[in-house]
Regions:
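A short beta-loop-alpha structural element at the N-terminal edge
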Residues: 6-20
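Conserved beta-strand in the GNAT
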Residues: 61, 67-76, 94, 99
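Conserved GNAT acetyl-CoA-binding A-motif
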Residues: 121-133
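Conserved acetyl-CoA binding element of GNAT-fold acetyltransferases
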Residues: 86-102, 154
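Conserved GNAT-fold acetyl-CoA-binding loop/helix
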Residues: 26-47
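Conserved acetyl-CoA pyrophosphate-binding loop and the N-cap/start of the following alpha-helix
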Residues: 104-116
């Protein structure tokens, strides 16, 4: 146990907590709650089930005593376009859900979750890890060696 918490791999029985944390992550973001679809939990659980069935899903939990105080979800990234590059050159992982309960933030928990996931991604042959960070989360990831890329965006909806 590190600083009153421990990091462990999540199991299928933990998926509802990971899905709940994913919803909380969005509710703690600048996205208005009204933007979330009503069935966000069911959609997240279905997404997780598909990723688990494909064998590409990793989850990690931060536990303090018997309470889950944080989680991370990641998976092999299939990409946004046809995969024509050999896997040894381009086998990406995508971290899509890092959440730490507000009362436990600023204690290194998100960094510990990330370090554990990175340790497990390397032996899987991942060549790069991608994520999208909130303003609050960016310093955490930059401290782990992540850097800004050439991704550009254009908001078409005001």
């Amino acid at each position: 146990m590190n600083g009153g918490y421990e990091i462990c791999a999540g199991e299928q029985m933990d998926d509802p907590v990971v899905a709940d944390h994913f919803g909380k992550m969005w509710r703690h973001s600048p996205v208005p709650e009204s933007a979330l679809v009503d069935d966000w939990f069911d959609r997240t659980m279905a997404f997780i089930a598909d990723a688990r069935a494909a064998g590409t899903f990793l989850t990690y939990l931060a536990r303090s005593h018997d309470e889950i105080i944080g989680s991370l979800a990641a998976q092999q990234f299939a990409g946004l376009y046809p995969d024509v590059i050999r896997h040894e050159y381009r086998r990406y992982a995508y971290v899509w859900g890092v959440f730490v309960c507000p009362a436990h933030r600023r204690q290194g928990i998100a960094s510990a979750l990330m370090r554990r996931s990175l340790d497990d991604m390397r032996p899987l042959g991942c060549s790069r890890v991608l994520l999208h960070a909130s303003v609050m989360g960016s310093p955490v990831y930059e401290g782990l060696g992540f850097n800004a890329t050439n991704e550009l965006k254009l908001d078409l909806v005001a």
